[in-house]
Amino acid sequence: MITRDLYQRLIDLRAHAPHKALELARSRRRRPLLAPYDQLGSGSSSGTRLFLVAADHPARGAIGVGGDPMRMADRRDLLSRLTTALSHPGVDGLLATPDIVEDLLLLGSLTGSSLLDDKVVFGSMNRGGLSGSAWELDDPITAYHTGGLFKMQLDGGKLLLRIDRDDPDSLKTIYQCARAIRVITSQKSPLAVMVEPLPAYRDEDGALKIDTSPEALIGVIAIVSGLGPTSAYTWLKLPPPSSDPRRVFAASSLPVLLLGGDPGDRGDELLASWAEAMEAPTVRGLVAGRSLIYPADDDVEGWVDRAARIVHPDL
């Protein structure tokens, strides 16, 4: 729990020492994403999977959870929930926008226990396709760009790519993502690029929806696997399909991280879908946000623990 006093100190530190976040980022103790290839084969799942907590929704204007449109609006509450999650030994890291990464770095310096040391940190990149906007599928890079990822010494970048073949704006985002992959992987020491490809469509009311059918997911997996001049550093972030996960994830040899979403009161069903999908050979872990940080019963620690044990059975 982040007390009012601690949060006030964070606010003061931001106002009076804006340079501090970069200093802390550059001194952060990093770790590899996974164990080195030559260390595989020990029989343990240690070092072969990743469990990341996601907190990049607010920057896209998506602050609702369940039936509460303002659930993620209180930053102190959000940070408290994230610190609870990141303190779990089964959580390997974070996916977030610059503001949240910096908040957590600063909080760590104030408490004397870094929240992001020995964690994998992915920076969220394109947040411009605001939730519910008329231009939602035209999703430009408005958060971390390539230079920002390297300057803050993060471990990777994340791109969202929703593809609706009936909406020309999707093509703009496909190009943005391909260009970002090219720039990131052309650096002397490339970073991982996590791409979240989602088959999208508009319902009768014009609302954007995601199609999780096997056929639709296989189609976008094929498209994204070929983006950019190399796929060597590309990871896929995908929802559990509505059926037949092994068939879906057989569409590519690229590593996959499952996403969470907002399950409402169907959290147990979501956990079961993760457990089933985790059996596919390419699935290497989980990236979950609202489903664990704002569960229906508000037991953040309990839900994070259950998810961690799906990803890391040896816990």
Please give the residue ranges for each predicted region.
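N-proximal accessory regions
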Residues: T3-H19, P36-G43, S114, P239, ...
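Conserved beta-strand segments of the P-loop GTPase G domain that flank and frequently precede/overlap
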Residues: A54, L159-L161, G260
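N-terminal capping/small domains of soluble enzymes
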Residues: M1-S113, V120
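Short active-site-adjacent structural elements
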Residues: G61-I63, D265-D268, Y294-D297
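C-terminal helical cap(s) of enzyme catalytic domains, especially alpha/beta-barrels
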Residues: I293-L315
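Short acidic/histidine-rich active-site segments
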Residues: G285-I293
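Alpha/beta enzyme core
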Residues: G66-P89, G93, V101-G108, G112-L116, ...
